[in-house]
């Protein structure tokens, strides 16, 4: 039985003080973290230290939203995995569609980041997903399969990787893939992992859904056999909504 995982991606939202306040509210409303579901939050880089101080010892994981593939150097504005490790991160999100769209994170760049993060002992949330144009052309499976294969190129062990399927057309738009649409892609991703590694590895890898997950649709999504939790954007900025989604995952 795969353990569900729900991670809140706060993106470029919340000041340090606001992030500390939100993480405290999540702890207060969530109570003890259930053994049936991992929980993580990914604040913006400046808030990592403050949030880590709040969630340390609660069982909630600290995640980063991105990393660079070099240890150090002249890369203005970037953050290394060693810095993230020292800040208390246990997870890092790699290949989010907004990174791919706005910052030129190609599949080969994503692959370099995946391998660098793993080398530092971080768990990776590898994001994949198709655009609306790609879905309408009927090439969702081909696009996502390519992203998975190229993102995992040269990665010998998938044990420390979570895959997040995030249809780009459903991120921040209010649109959501139906539970059956999401399940179809998740099953395809699991089959791809089986081909790259093994059936046991595929059976064990957790695949999150990300794309306008809300308290109203979380339970239905998480009931699907290949959906193992969520990478939550907008709803994670509200403690009550985020905790409701976590509770839905715990029950599924």
UniProtKB/Swiss-Prot annotation:
Active-site residue list: 96, 166
Annotated localization: Cytoplasm
Biological process (GO), any one: glyceraldehyde-3-phosphate biosynthetic process
Catalytic reaction equation(s): D-glyceraldehyde 3-phosphate = dihydroxyacetone phosphate
Pathway where this protein functions: Carbohydrate biosynthesis; gluconeogenesis; Carbohydrate degradation; glycolysis; D-glyceraldehyde 3-phosphate from glycerone phosphate: step 1/1
Biological function: Involved in the gluconeogenesis. Catalyzes stereospecifically the conversion of dihydroxyacetone phosphate (DHAP) to D-glyceraldehyde-3-phosphate (G3P).
SUBUNIT field: Homodimer.
PANTHER family documented for this protein: TRIOSEPHOSPHATE ISOMERASE (PTHR21139:SF42)
Protein's name in the database: Triosephosphate isomerase
């Amino acid at each position: 039985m795969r353990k569900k995982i729900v991670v809140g991606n706060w993106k470029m939202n919340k000041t340090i003080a606001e992030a500390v306040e939100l993480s405290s509210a999540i702890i207060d409303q969530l109570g003890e973290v259930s053994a049936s579901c991992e929980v993580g939050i990914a604040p913006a880089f400046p808030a990592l230290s403050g949030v880590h101080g709040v969630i340390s010892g609660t069982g909630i994981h600290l995640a980063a939203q991105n990393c660079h593939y070099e240890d150090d150097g002249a890369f203005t504005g970037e953050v290394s995995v060693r810095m993230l490790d020292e800040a208390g991160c246990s997870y890092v999100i790699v290949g989010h569609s907004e990174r791919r769209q706005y910052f030129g994170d190609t599949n080969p760049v994503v692959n370099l980041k995946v391998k660098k993060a793993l080398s530092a002992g971080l768990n990776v949330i590898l994001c994949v997903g198709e655009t609306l144009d790609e879905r309408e052309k009927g090439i969702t499976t081909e696009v996502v399969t390519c992203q998975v294969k190229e993102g995992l190129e040269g990665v010998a062990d998938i044990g420390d990787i979570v895959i997040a399927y995030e249809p780009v057309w459903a991120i921040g738009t209010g649109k959501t893939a139906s539970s059956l649409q999401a399940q179809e892609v998740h099953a395809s991703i699991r089959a791809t992992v089986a081909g790259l590694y093994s059936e046991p590895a595929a059976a064990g890898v957790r695949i999150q859904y990300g794309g306008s997950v809300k308290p109203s649709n979380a339970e239905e999504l998480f009931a699907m056999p290949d959906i193992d939790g969520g990478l939550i954007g907008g709803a994670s900025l509200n403690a009550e909504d985020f905790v409701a989604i976590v509770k839905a995952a715990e029950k599924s």
